[in-house]
């Protein structure tokens, strides 16, 4: 992944964006480039009071484990991200306890609703501030019910099983 900016800060403001996001790749061929570009984005965003979300990933050959994702998340926070999005993994509490800013989990690949809700619950219990799900919401049989179930996990401390029951009742 060799990512660059797709819109300027002025364009983001014109679009009434609430935040800007950028992917950083630790251990990848273009690690240095993504970190420098992210640092520049943070500087630009801070001039306008725009929060920055860092989306963390690791290079090919590196496992999505707490060691590497934790390093990527901590680097993102130290470079000025206001919030970090990363993948859920074993020992997730290592990531949340070493990152200086709130961490949310990426939704990842499409999984059954009960599994997505269990992962969300485990992540929140391990210190995640929330979840950033895409396909596990919009590819759900009932996206509205899934959003409400995820909300129950994040804001009402519902377990994955309780949230799945809510999902089934609402769909």
Q: What is the predicted role of each segment?
A:
Residues 128-130, 138-143:
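Substrate-binding cleft of secreted/luminal carbohydrate-active enzymes
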Residues 115-117, 141-150:
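Histidine/acidic-residue-rich catalytic or RNA/ligand-binding cores of hydrolases
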Residues 1-105, 110-133, 152, 158-163:
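Alpha/beta enzyme core
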Residues 162-171:
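C-terminal accessory extensions appended to soluble enzyme cores
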Residues 135-139, 168:
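A short, acidic, flexible beta-alpha connecting loop/helix-capping segment that sits on the rim
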């Amino acid at each position: 992944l060799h990512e660059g900016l797709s819109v300027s800060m002025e364009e983001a403001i014109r679009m009434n964006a609430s935040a800007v996001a950028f992917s950083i790749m630790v251990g990848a061929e273009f690690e240095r480039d993504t970190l420098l570009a992210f640092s520049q984005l943070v500087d630009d965003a801070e001039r306008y009071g725009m929060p920055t979300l860092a989306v963390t990933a690791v290079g090919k050959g590196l496992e999505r484990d707490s060691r590497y994702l934790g390093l990527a998340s901590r680097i993102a926070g130290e470079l000025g991200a206001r919030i970090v999005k990363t993948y859920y993994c074993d020992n997730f509490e290592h990531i949340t306890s070493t990152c200086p800013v709130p961490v949310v989990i990426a939704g990842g690949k499409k999984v059954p609703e009960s599994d997505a809700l269990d992962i969300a619950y485990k992540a929140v219990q391990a210190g995640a501030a929330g979840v950033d799900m895409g396909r596990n919401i919009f590819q759900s049989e009932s996206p509205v019910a899934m959003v409400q179930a995820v909300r129950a996990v994040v804001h009402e401390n519902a377990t994955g099983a309780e949230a799945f029951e809510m999902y089934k009742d609402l769909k």
